[in-house]
C-alpha cells in the first residue's frame, strides 16, 4: 500500500512539470507584446487581443497539468 501511495505522489509531482512550460510560455507571449508595442506603439490595440489569446492558451495547458495532478492525488 505504501508503494502505491508513493507512486501517486511521484506521478503528481511529475505531472506538475507542465506548469513550468506554461509559465515560460506566458513570459514569452508578454515579452513579445512589450517588444511589439515598443517598436510600434500604434499597434497596441491590435496586438493586445492576440497576447490575451496566447496567454489563455498557455494558461490552459498549465491548468490541464494541474488538474491531472489533482486527479492523481485525490481520485485514483
Curated annotation (Swiss-Prot):
Sorted UniProt keywords: CF(0), Hydrogen ion transport, Ion transport, Lipid-binding, Membrane, Mitochondrion, Transmembrane, Transmembrane helix, Transport
Site positions per UniProt: Reversibly protonated during proton transport: 59
Transmembrane segments: 10-30, 52-72
GO biological process, one term: proton motive force-driven ATP synthesis
Location(s), subcellular: Mitochondrion membrane
Gene3D superfamilies in alphabetical order: F1F0 ATP synthase subunit C
Pfam families documented for this protein: ATP-synt_C
Entry's Gene Ontology molecular function annotations: lipid binding; proton transmembrane transporter activity
Membrane topology label: Multi-pass membrane protein
GO cellular component term of the entry, any: mitochondrial membrane
Organism domain of life: Eukaryota
InterPro entries: ATP_synth_F0_csu, ATP_synth_F0_csu_DDCD_BS, ATP_synth_F0_csu_sf, ATPase_proteolipid_c-like_dom, F/V-ATP_Csub_sf
Assembly description: F-type ATPases have 2 components, CF(1) - the catalytic core - and CF(0) - the membrane proton channel. CF(1) has five subunits: alpha(3), beta(3), gamma(1), delta(1), epsilon(1). CF(0) has three main subunits: a, b and c.
Stated family: Belongs to the ATPase C chain family.
Described function: Mitochondrial membrane ATP synthase (F(1)F(0) ATP synthase or Complex V) produces ATP from ADP in the presence of a proton gradient across the membrane which is generated by electron transport complexes of the respiratory chain. F-type ATPases consist of two structural domains, F(1) - containing the extramembraneous catalytic core and F(0) - containing the membrane proton channel, linked together by a central stalk and a peripheral stalk. During catalysis, ATP synthesis in the catalytic domain of F(1) is coupled via a rotary mechanism of the central stalk subunits to proton translocation.
PANTHER family per UniProt: ATP SYNTHASE LIPID-BINDING PROTEIN, MITOCHONDRIAL, ATPASE PROTEIN 9
HAMAP family: ATP_synth_c_bact (MF_01396)
Protein's UniProt name: ATP synthase subunit 9, mitochondrial
Organism: Kluyveromyces lactis (strain ATCC 8585 / CBS 2359 / DSM 70799 / NBRC 1267 / NRRL Y-1140 / WM37)
Amino acid at each position: 500500500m505504501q508503494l502505491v501511495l508513493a507512486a501517486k505522489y511521484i506521478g503528481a509531482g511529475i505531472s506538475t512539470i507542465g506548469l513550468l512550460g506554461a509559465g515560460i510560455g506566458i513570459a514569452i507571449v508578454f515579452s513579445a507584446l512589450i517588444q511589439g508595442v515598443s517598436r510600434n506603439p500604434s499597434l497596441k490595440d491590435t496586438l493586445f487581443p492576440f497576447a490575451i489569446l496566447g496567454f489563455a492558451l498557455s494558461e490552459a495547458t498549465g491548468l490541464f497539468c494541474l488538474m491531472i495532478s489533482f486527479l492523481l492525488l485525490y481520485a485514483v
